[in-house]
Amino acid sequence: MKANTMFIILCLSLSTLCVSSQSTSVHGKIFVPNRAVKLSSDGNYPFDLSKEDGAQPYFMTPRLRFYPIGKRAAGEMEQSEGQNPETKSHSWRKRSVLTPSLSSLGESLESGISKRISINQDLKAITDMLLTEQIQARRRCLDALRQRLLDLGKRDSDVSLFNGDLLPNGRCS
């Protein structure tokens, strides 16, 4: 019973939120409570996503901009946006194809791939080094065990020194 009443209260509160966020008409004008007004890249063409100011439809469509990762990390996007030929014109008809941004994206992808390859090579070198150290430690352990058995005079042909089970804990004594 409590779950049903909670569900009904939740639905009613969500429906009132949805109704209050929609646009209302007063004296023939449309008022939108939360208007999303954005500026173009040069700041001269403000457009409203509610289409009240008669902006061109291609101004309202968001454009994807690709910047080199170095500029993003250094925070140089805002300063270099004025020199960028993609952001100087707004119209899709006047803009050229995104070849500069795609080439910079390709360069960053190539640098990421080369970094990943170098990291993989470093990891392989580290694992090889660890494996050779383990092999050398195992050989030293076997040599020490062989010497101890020889010293004690208990060298027997049935004893296998090259299996991995030297001691129950896997170490030399």
Swiss-Prot record:
Signal peptide limits: 1-21
Cystine pairings recorded for this chain: 141-172
Record-given protein name: Atrial gland and califin peptides
MF-aspect GO terms: hormone activity
Alphabetical list of InterPro entries matching this protein: ELH
Sites bearing Isoleucine amide, chain numbering: 69
Function comment: The atrial gland peptide A and peptide B precursors are the source of the 2 peptides that, upon release from this reproductive system gland, initiate the egg-laying process by exciting the bag cell neurons. These neurons, clustered in neural connectives near the abdominal ganglion, in turn release other peptides that act directly on the ganglion and also, via the circulating hemolymph, on many other organs to control the physiological processes of egg-laying. One of these other peptides is the egg-laying hormone.
Annotated organism of origin: Aplysia californica (California sea hare)
Disordered, as annotated region: 75-94
Keyword Lyase: no
GO CC list: extracellular region
Keyword Amino-acid biosynthesis: no
